[in-house]
């Protein structure tokens, strides 16, 4: 579950903090209110593409951090394999952009953008207007079902339906 977003020096945002509630969270607002910038900051923290032009004009860097709480065994196993410490089931994704450089961190440990993307794909799936590609992937359907039941379906069932 996504718990918190922290953004600093990104586009028009000097600094912002958002706490998320359990369940569905919806960003709404007038045109130009900053919804796209917030989604962009999440994308940045998740390892997505971001332009250095997004760094606030009066700043040297932009920072985006997301805090998640998870008990998903496959995610915790992968973090253990990567030697990323996890306390209280919290996973903190952080990305700092300065000039042409990008520094990614998972729970304070420096990682590559590829690793950040791998872990983030196990934590969240962001869908904007007309963005639903992962829902078209049949393999993703089983992951979604497994996440709701907190069990992994028998591989034979998976093969029969994919």
Model-inferred region functions:
Residues 4-7, 11-144, 151-159:
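Gly/Lys-enriched N-terminal cap/neck module of very large, oligomeric protein machines
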């Amino acid at each position: 579950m996504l718990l918190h977003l922290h953004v600093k020096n990104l586009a028009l945002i000097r600094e912002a903090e958002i706490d998320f509630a359990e369940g569905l969270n919806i960003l709404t607002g007038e045109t130009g209110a900053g919804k796209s910038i917030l989604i962009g900051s999440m994308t940045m923290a998740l390892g997505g593409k971001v332009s250095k032009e997004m760094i606030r004009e009066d700043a040297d860097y932009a920072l985006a951090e997301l805090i998640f709480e998870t008990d998903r065994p496959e995610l915790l196993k992968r973090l253990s394999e990567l030697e990323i410490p996890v306390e209280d089931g919290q996973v903190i994704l952080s990305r700092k952009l300065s000039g042409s450089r990008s520094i990614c961190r998972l729970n304070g440990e420096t990682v590559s953008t590829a690793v950040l993307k791998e872990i983030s794909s196990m934590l969240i799936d962001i869908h904007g207007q007309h963005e639903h590609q992962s829902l078209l992937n049949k393999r993703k359907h089983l992951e979604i079902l497994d996440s709701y039941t907190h069990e992994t379906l028998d591989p034979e069932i998976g093969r029969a339906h994919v």
